[in-house]
């Protein structure tokens, strides 16, 4: 029995070695098991492995040790079962004594009884989740303390020498087996070379003439599997300028000839006899083959000069070319109707028409016979419902879980008001469209005629298009009058001040606390800093630490939740620090690194620091880490919380500062091991908070009425109004301006200033300027003004109680922006804005009951309401597999984690056990979404990585095209030049390649109405991605004009976004059957292909697909077999079951008369 268990253990280890390192050698497996027997501890086993096999991965050795121990435990449990049955009485006595001891220990514990019960409840809930979702609680393979060095006793020197001798013997045996294996492989390859499976381009074959026609002869090729015939055109038989009257003058039937393959298209092969010496078989025109190879190599080397010289992929690439040539050739053929084809036959028979003059004649192939083509069958696919091993039963358990809630009371007054405002917003859009249609109808009919004329005179259609574009876009592009008044003729940049930088720094609330702050940092390893917006904590703390000498031990890192904030803050600190940006003070954001070896203070996004944790979990390059704006609770910030807690335990000298603008002090302090709080007192004054008596149905109208009442009846002081988004703010500004204008000139001036993230930072600076005497300003802003902006002079705040929040739907796997009530903490933060300059008032446009009963205590963190695919992939790459027990401040919902794991599994990043694959490891190295990473890596195998690099870079930027108001028709004409029938991705590729051919010139961009800044940004992103691909030896190959490869690569990453044309209207997604539509700006708008893939969905008046690409449905099953499968032809698919059969209209019978149940 022991021998059988030993054999099973050896086979298990062999399988793991084969899976991870590609060599399942039995001797190596026995050696590893022997080391595990000699070293019962994991640290000793890892050390023994590293000494004997230097390049052996530590994570693999830990995995093998756990596997061996697990197998050993199985054997010990089976042998001990009998002993347990015989010793029940003894075990009972031991249990009694153990229970007594445990009770005594518990009584002597310092923990409170309530804390003990709470811990017990949490452990029970965790155990329940573990049982329901075992795939989310996989043990972490790599422990953090495995890297510590363990001293080896002197007594083990003999053992070490024996192990080395064994290893040397194994190495010699392994090398011998590898030589024998290579010899066998070489012999098999030589045998395979004798007969080719497919014809090879430019190779010379022997053949026999099978038939002779007027335009050439057909030759049956030898040396290829199966029967293959090719055409030698009459022009390819004799070299020189000798003209043949008929091929029978040179060749005879059954004659042996030597031919060279010129091209392979579908099943048609084009051959040449004149390029081959018929006696010796020598290639008389080798230059053609050489030039094609040189051009291919030059293209690849130009794209990536550092790529490895790997010739093993040639055969696979050739096969891909053959398959794609079939698709391209069949697509480009011109089909002739059967009556026309009969007429052509009659003309040829009468001698009026020659064969080369036929429309379906090809110089290389000859006549293309469309009769051979069969009509395409209706290809139906459906979702693959097979669950991986690590997610077995999770879908059933997910149905029992409650959905993600971002609203406390879905039927409350606040939620009803949000729904009403959404309906009113749609009404405003419809009213705008109606105005546009009325303007279109007002155009003279005679000017519209050239637009409908298929063959207009030169210039007529251009004039009509200009008029139509002015009518169609004039409402949208014309600058409203309120904007003209607000912006004025002169714009001042920045907050006007006459004080020096030193005086500005000393005027901040944090300056008097400088010494106390440094003292607190030196005494505590972790510090939670609470300070309101404008206290100076972001710009000053890092400088205080650098001045105190913390920058000599390592960098001072400061994270920001937004890229714009990281760049702007670093510029300000560099100015105060007295250095050039990028030297002592720098910043790092995605695809942009503005630092140097001299950098002391480094500002970065929280995502950048998370990626640095992937490479160095200890963050050894930093002496201090500042997590700024932690109250915003982004996904990366929440993950960094848990990682930094672990890093603090491993590095006692590391200092971590958590800053927040809200007073969630107890929560942060409790999570960070009762960390010390450092509070920066702000300039706060009392605020009078007022509620409405009844709920407001239209909060936008109520807000504007409140603004006018304050302006007409309250003392001087500026107003701050919170709304949800750009569209709502613009509508409010327009309505408010018209209402104030209708009051006449006797009313004091009201300056209307909008603020939202889409506005340039230079345009937002007007809100900081004081209003002129005798006037008042109203700032209408999103929740960006809650904490990120400090506006002086605000005495009145109007809070409708809503904001836009990103919410993830695990059912369809998409994020969406929804209008939802704010939290109580956000409401307090908004009211606090009125007490910065003096005593103020806050008008809450909801009832006090709604504040207490319908608002959550604090905002839901982003990690609990958004997609976690990228986050889970990063954590898996760090070795964190136990996601349920990871130390999150607020754990994400289980259904969101399961959805992320399913997505990564379908992309091939996870295996059947939920562990990271080699593909997943590569995907984690790219700073991209998992779909884009998979698309980029798959393009290497498909032979189109050069083009996909460009597509990914162009997708990362926005607003490539622009349409100036006065030249909209010309801009549309220029844009149409770049259109590709395959879709928007190829259109973006065409734009970049055209810009590249113009030597990246700015005049070309201006001429073609393309944003030069966006293209330069895409160029920088592309260079960064090329650097990562070079680092991991990924080839950069160009597909040329073969767009099928590019479409396949896009499909390999975004297969979940596939949609099929709906017979009634628009499209329906394959995953959920959701109705979607192609965006009007798309290349494929009004073309309506049957199958498409989209990059993202945008919700305006409809669910629009943006960046759309056509696909072949067969690719979905081929490239994503874990996600899609072909429907069973013997059964009705789920999609067809949902379709309703509508009979043809029959005025004499009932519509349901055809049903068997209705028949008599």
From Swiss-Prot:
UniProt region (Disordered), positions on chain: 75-140, 153-192, 294-334, 409-438
Major localisation: nucleus
Compositionally biased tracts (Basic and acidic residues): 155-192, 425-438
InterPro entries: DEAD-box_helicase_OB_fold, DEAD/DEAH_box_helicase_dom, DHX8/Prp22_DEXHc, DNA/RNA_helicase_DEAH_CS, HA2_WH, Helicase-assoc_dom, Helicase_ATP-bd, Helicase_C-like
Helicase ATP-binding domain segment(s): 518-681
Compartment list: Nucleus
Compositional bias (Polar residues): 412-424
Gene Ontology CC: catalytic step 2 spliceosome; spliceosomal complex
EC number: 3.6.4.13
A Pfam entry, by short name: DEAD
Domain Helicase C-terminal: 699-879
Oligomer status and interactors: Identified in the spliceosome complex.
Family label: Belongs to the DEAD box helicase family. DEAH subfamily. DDX8/PRP22 sub-subfamily.
Annotated protein name in UniProt: ATP-dependent RNA helicase dhx8
């Amino acid at each position: 029995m022991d021998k059988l268990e030993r054999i099973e253990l050896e086979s298990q280890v062999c399988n793991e070695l084969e899976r991870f390192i590609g060599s399942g050698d039995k001797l190596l497996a026995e050696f590893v098991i022997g080391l595990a027997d000699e070293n019962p501890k994991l640290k000793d086993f890892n050390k023994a492995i590293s000494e004997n096999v230097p390049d052996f991965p530590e994570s693999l050795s830990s995995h093998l040790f756990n596997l061996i121990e697990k197998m050993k435990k199985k054997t010990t449990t089976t042998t001990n079962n009998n002993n347990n049955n015989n010793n029940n009485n003894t075990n009972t006595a031991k249990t009694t004594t153990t229970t007594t001891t445990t009770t005594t220990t518990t009584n002597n514990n310092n923990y409170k009884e309530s804390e003990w019960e709470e811990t017990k409840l949490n452990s029970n809930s965790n155990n329940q989740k573990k049982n329901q979702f075992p795939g989310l609680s996989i043990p972490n393979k790599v422990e953090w303390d495995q890297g510590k060095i363990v001293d080896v006793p002197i007594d083990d020197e003999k053992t070490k020498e024996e192990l080395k001798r064994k290893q040397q013997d194994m190495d010699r045996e392994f090398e011998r087996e590898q030589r024998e294996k290579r010899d066998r492989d070489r012999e098999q390859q030589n045998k395979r070379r004798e007969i080719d499976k497919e014809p090879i381009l430019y190779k010379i074959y022997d053949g026999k003439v099978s038939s002779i026609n007027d335009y050439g002869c057909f030759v049956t090729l030898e040396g290829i599997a199966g029967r293959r015939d090719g055409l030698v055109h009459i022009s390819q038989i004799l070299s020189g300028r000798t003209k043949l009257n008929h091929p029978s003058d040179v060749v005879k039937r059954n004659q042996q000839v030597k031919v060279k393959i010129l091209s392979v298209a579908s099943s048609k092969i084009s051959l040449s006899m004149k390029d081959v010496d018929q006696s010796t078989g020598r290639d008389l025109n080798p230059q053609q083959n050489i030039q094609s190879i040189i051009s291919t190599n030059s293209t690849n080397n130009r794209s990536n000069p550092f790529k490895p010289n790997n010739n093993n992929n040639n055969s696979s690439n050739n096969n891909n070319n053959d398959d794609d040539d079939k698709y391209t050739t069949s697509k480009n053929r011109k089909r002739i109707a059967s009556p026309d084809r009969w007429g052509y036959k009659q003309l040829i028979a009468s001698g009026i028409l020659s064969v080369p003059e036929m429309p379906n004649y090809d110089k290389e192939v000859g006549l293309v016979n469309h009769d051979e083509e069969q009509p395409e069958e209706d290809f139906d696919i459906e979702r693959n419902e097979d669950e991986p091993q690590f997610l077995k039963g999770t879908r059933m358990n997910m149905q029992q879980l409650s959905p993600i809630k971002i609203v406390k009371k879905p039927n409350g007054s606040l939620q009803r008001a949000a729904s009403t405002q959404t309906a009113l917003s749609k009404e405003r859009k419809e009213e705008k469209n109606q105005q546009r249609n009325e303007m279109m109808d007002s155009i003279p009919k005679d000017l519209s005629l050239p637009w409908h004329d298929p063959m207009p005179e030169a210039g007529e259609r251009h004039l009509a298009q200009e008029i139509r574009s002015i009518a169609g876009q004039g409402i949208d592009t014309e600058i409203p009058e309120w904007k003209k008044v607000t912006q004025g003729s002169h714009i001042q940049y920045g907050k006007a001040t006459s004080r020096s930088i030193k005086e500005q720094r000393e005027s901040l609330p944090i300056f008097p606390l400088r010494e106390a702050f440094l003292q607190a940092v030196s005494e505590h390893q972790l510090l939670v800093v609470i300070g309101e917006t404008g206290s100076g904590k972001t710009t000053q703390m890092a400088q205080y630490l650098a001045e105190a000498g913390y920058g000599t031990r390592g960098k001072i890192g400061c994270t920001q939740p937004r890229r714009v904030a990281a760049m702007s803050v670093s510029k300000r600190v560099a100015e105060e620090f007295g250095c050039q940006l990028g030297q002592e003070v720098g910043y790092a954001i995605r695809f942009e690194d503005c630092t140097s070896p001299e950098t002391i203070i480094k500002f970065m996004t929280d995502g950048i620091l998370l990626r640095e944790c992937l490479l160095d979990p200890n963050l050894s390059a930093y002496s201090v880490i500042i997590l700024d704006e932690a109250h915003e609770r982004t996904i990366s910030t929440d993950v960094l919380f848990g990682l930094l807690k672990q890093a603090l335990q491993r590095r006692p000298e590391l200092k971590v500062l958590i800053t927040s603008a809200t007073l969630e002090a107890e929560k942060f302090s409790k999570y960070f091991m009762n960390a010390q709080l450092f509070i920066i007192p702000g300039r706060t004054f009392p605020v009078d908070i007022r509620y409405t008596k009844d709920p407001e149905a239209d909060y936008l109208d109520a807000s504007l009425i409140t603004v006018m009442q304050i302006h007409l009846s309250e003392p001087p002081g500026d107003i701050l109004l919170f709304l949800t988004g750009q569209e709502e703010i613009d509508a409010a500004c327009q309505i408010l301006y018209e209402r104030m204008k209708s009051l006449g000139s006797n009313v004091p001036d009201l300056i209307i200033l909008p603020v939202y993230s889409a506005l340039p930072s230079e345009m937002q600076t007007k809100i900081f300027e004081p209003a002129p005497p005798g006037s008042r300003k109203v700032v209408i802003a999103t929740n960006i003004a809650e904490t990120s902006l400090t506006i002086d002079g605000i005495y009145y705040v109007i809070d409708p109680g809503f904001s836009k929040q990103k919410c993830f739907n695990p059912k369809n796997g998409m994020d969406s922006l929804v209008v939802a009530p704010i939290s109580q903490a956000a409401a307090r933060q908004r009211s606090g804005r009125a007490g910065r300059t003096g005593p103020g008032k806050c008008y809450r446009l909801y009832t006090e009951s709604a504040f207490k009963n319908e608002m959550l205590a604090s905002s839901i963190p982003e990690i609990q309401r958004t997609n976690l695919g990228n986050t889970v992939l990063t954590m898996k790459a760090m070795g964190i597999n136990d996601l349920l027990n990871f130390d999150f401040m607020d754990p994400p919902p289980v259904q969101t984690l399961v959805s992320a794991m399913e997505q990564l599994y379908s992309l091939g990043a996870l295996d059947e056990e939920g562990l990271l694959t080699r593909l997943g490891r590569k995907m984690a190295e790219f700073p991209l979404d998992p779909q884009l990473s998979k698309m980029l890596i798959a393009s290497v195998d498909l032979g189109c990585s050069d083009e996909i690099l460009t597509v990914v870079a162009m997708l990362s930027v926005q607003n490539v095209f622009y349409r100036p108001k006065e030249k909209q028709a010309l801009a549309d004409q220029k844009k149409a030049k770049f259109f590709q029938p395959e879709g928007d991705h190829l259109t973006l590729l065409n734009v970049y390649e055209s810009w590249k051919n113009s030597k990246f010139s700015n005049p070309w961009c201006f001429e073609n109405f393309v944003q030069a800044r966006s293209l330069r940004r895409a160029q920088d992103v592309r260079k960064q991605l090329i650097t990562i691909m070079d680092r991991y030896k990924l080839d950069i190959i160009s597909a040329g004009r073969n767009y099928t490869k590019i479409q396949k690569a896009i499909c390999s990453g975004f297969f979940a976004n596939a949609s099929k044309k709906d017979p009634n209207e628009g499209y329906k997604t394959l995953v959920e059957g959701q109705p979607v539509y192609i965006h009007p700006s798309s290349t494929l708008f009004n073309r309506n292909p049957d199958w498409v893939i989209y990059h993202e969905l945008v919700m305006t008046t409809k669910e629009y697909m943006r960046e759309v690409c056509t696909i072949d449905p067969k690719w979905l099953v081929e490239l994503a077999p874990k996600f899609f499968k072909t429907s069973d032809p013997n059964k009705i698919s789920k999609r067809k079951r949902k379709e309703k059969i509508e009979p043809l209209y029959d005025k004499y019978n009932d519509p349901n008369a055809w049903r068997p149940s209705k028949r008599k």
